[in-house]
């Protein structure tokens, strides 16, 4: 899918915009040559295996990590500009809350630290889960603590909410409740959400935008509704026990040969042979194919990429 977005799009249209972004540690590059854009008002799934660079990317967006190369902007403003701080909220997997504080004290702390605090929204989120305001945070269940953490995040009224595996420790019922809460609050406020998660089905239900990272590089970026139809799952019979030469005319993400039958995830660059069976893959199948094949050519949908100099990239 080529990038055909208009050159006069304003930077404010992009919640996050990276150009040539990279981070190197002693052991090597955690992220390298990352250029992408996430539109404002979207719920973006950040996908990748352990060690892919997801947490590093979120760390760069929250100024917890300093980049080695490149540039990262939040709503068109450099991420290290103090003006960005009130616009961004971050919720990590460990949800660092003061266990000796009561829920009420925790929300009061949020009000004192954030000038634009929305007490009504924070209290609404807590009350919806029947969380006792007088209970100490350390006595709450995992689902209740997560709800309090979400209340702190949304009470800040951020324009950009960054979530690092926020629901990994929840049971299925609590996870469903938090997912519903997240989507409702994001839609109501127009908040841009970037959420890292290993749960592909969860992302499929919630996210309308995707950023796929593998081995420190961007593998896919763009609208979920455009990324999936760009792929076709083909199955056919091998004539000589090897992959058919016709595959070379298409972008092959992943292929496998079992006996005399082959199967491949491709991005067609023209008509496919009539004797091949064709099916549209699920989002999960597309993501897994790209994660298993980090050397496959990357894919960006319209507007999702700029090059390191900030110009449109095809």
Enumerate the language-model features and the residues they cover.
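Conserved ABC transporter NBD signature motif
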Residues: 62, 69-84
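The feature captures the beta-strand-to-loop junction immediately N-terminal to the Walker
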Residues: 47-49
């Amino acid at each position: 899918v080529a990038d055909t977005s208009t050159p006069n799009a304003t930077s404010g249209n992009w919640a996050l915009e990276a150009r040539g972004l990279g981070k190197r540690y002693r052991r090597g590059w955690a992220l390298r040559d990352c250029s992408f854009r996430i539109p404002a008002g979207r719920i973006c799934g950040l996908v990748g295996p352990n060690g892919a660079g997801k947490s590093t990317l979120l760390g760069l967006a929250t100024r917890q990590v300093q980049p080695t190369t490149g540039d990262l902007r939040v709503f068109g403003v450099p991420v290290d500009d103090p003006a960005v701080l009130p616009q961004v909220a971050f919720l990590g997997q460990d949800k660092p809350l003061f266990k000796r504080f009561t829920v009420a004290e925790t929300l009061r702390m949020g009000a004192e630290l954030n000038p634009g605090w929305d007490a009504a929204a924070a209290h609404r989120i807590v009350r919806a889960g029947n969380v006792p305001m007088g209970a100490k945070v350390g006595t709450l269940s995992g689902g209740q603590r997560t709800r309090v953490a979400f209340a702190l995040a949304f009470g800040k009224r951020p324009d950009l909410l960054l979530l690092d595996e926020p629901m990994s420790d929840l049971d299925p019922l609590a996870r469903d409740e938090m997912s519903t809460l997240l989507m409702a609050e994001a839609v109501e406020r127009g908040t841009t959400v970037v959420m890292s998660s290993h749960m592909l089905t969860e992302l499929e239900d919630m996210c309308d935008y995707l950023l796929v990272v593998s081995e420190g590089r961007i593998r896919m970026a763009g609208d979920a509704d455009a990324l999936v139809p760009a792929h076709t799952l083909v199955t056919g019979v091998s004539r000589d026990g090897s992959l058919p030469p016709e595959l070379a005319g298409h972008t092959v993400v992943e292929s496998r040969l079992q006996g005399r039958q082959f199967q491949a995830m491709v991005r067609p660059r023209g008509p496919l042979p009539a004797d091949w069976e064709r099916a549209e893959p699920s989002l999960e199948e597309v993501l897994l194919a790209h994660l298993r094949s980090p050397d496959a050519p990357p894919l960006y949908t319209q507007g999702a990429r700029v090059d390191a100099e900030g110009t449109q990239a095809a």
